[in-house]
Amino acid sequence: MKALHFGAGNIGRGFIGKLLADAGIQLTFADVNQVVLDALNARHSYQVHVVGENEQVDTVSGVNAVSSIGDDVVDLIAHVDLITTAVGPVVLERIAPAIAKGLVKRKAQGVDAPLNIIACENMVRGTTQLKGHVMNALPEDAKAWVEEHVGFVDSAVDRIVPPSASATNDPLEVTVETFSEWIVDKTQFKGALPNIPGMELTDNLMAFVERKLFTLNTGHAITAYLGKLAGHQTIRDAILDESIRAVVKGAMEESGAVLIKRYGFDADKHAAYIQKILGRFENPYLKDDVERVGRQPLRKLSAGDRLIKPLLGTLEYGLPHVNLVKGIAAAMHFRSDEDPQAQELAALITEKGPQAALAQISGLDANSDVVAEAVNAYNATK
């Protein structure tokens, strides 16, 4: 089996690329970073530090790389069996024209073997969005062929891969946590379902997408925002602060009550999942900075994201949300010289006041009780 993976960054190398290569798949990375491309093509291997209670160093081997903006990547798309991405939500639109060109070439060469494309991004139904961009870039006469022969498979991914300075200045070395989860929608594949260790197949993807968003992402963000307010440097420092831990755990339990109601998750198993995530935040080997995790607060306070979406669920089912509200208030306090969204947030609150600013960012009704609760919590933490 041959695979092409867009994005040779930390997540590409430390998570998806590693799983594919470990499964014996012939893997080529596509990226724009020439230093990384040259290193991959010189060595065809790299090291992954898996850190947790049992630290280990795994070597990923047998890999190649091409530029994601050259002709080589188009040629590859005409022949591979699987395309994956870990480029970041914003970049999906940029790689779509190359994918479209490759699909046109595949059709012209009469390659009718099924091809599946899986975007492994921190977003809901990212592959469906990528499909929209690819379809827009395709000529009309190729669209029906693509619909017939190409599967666009949505997925949910979860592994913490913080930026970490390599002791050896190796551009390929990467550090990851032990935990990883890659869940894909088996109803969207063309042809036979792949058997890749570490890839889980489900016919109810949204349950797992929201479980991750409402638990890991919600908890991670609230830990970062409360941690920043309290002067902590890392996620570990923040979650070991008992007052922060109580709010984070409480928020994950509140969002969990929504998941249990909506999808029928088992309450005891979900409680264990929350404990596992708290343990991941405590990992002493992951130097995960609160500033990094908290960045882009406008996106994280938007209606479909990790803070407001679970809150809307509590309103839908008439469930408590006191800790989620504290997390939202802390997010409104996030300030960072490095992050344009943090500056935009601060300017908006200064200009309009917290009530109107939160309503504008989140889509919540400015006159609702829950916005009043958030503003009270915001004012109480000044």
Swiss-Prot record:
Name the record gives this protein: Mannitol-1-phosphate 5-dehydrogenase
Disulphide linkage map: none
GO molecular function, one term: mannitol-1-phosphate 5-dehydrogenase activity
Family of this protein: Belongs to the mannitol dehydrogenase family.
Cellular component aspect of the GO annotation: cytosol
Listed GO biological process terms: mannitol catabolic process
Reactions this protein catalyses: D-mannitol 1-phosphate + NAD(+) = beta-D-fructose 6-phosphate + NADH + H(+)
Record bears the keyword Membrane: no
Keyword entries, A-Z: NAD, Oxidoreductase
Residues in the signal sequence: none
Enzyme Commission number: 1.1.1.17
PANTHER family recorded: ALTRONATE OXIDOREDUCTASE-RELATED, MANNITOL-1-PHOSPHATE 5-DEHYDROGENASE
Matching HAMAP family: Mannitol_dehydrog
Residues the record lists as binding NAD(+): 3-14
InterPro entries assigned: 6-PGluconate_DH-like_C_sf, 6PGD_dom2, Mannitol_1_phos_5_DH, Mannitol_DH, Mannitol_DH_C, Mannitol_DH_CS, Mannitol_DH_N, NAD(P)-bd_dom_sf
Enzyme class: oxidoreductase
Keyword NAD: yes
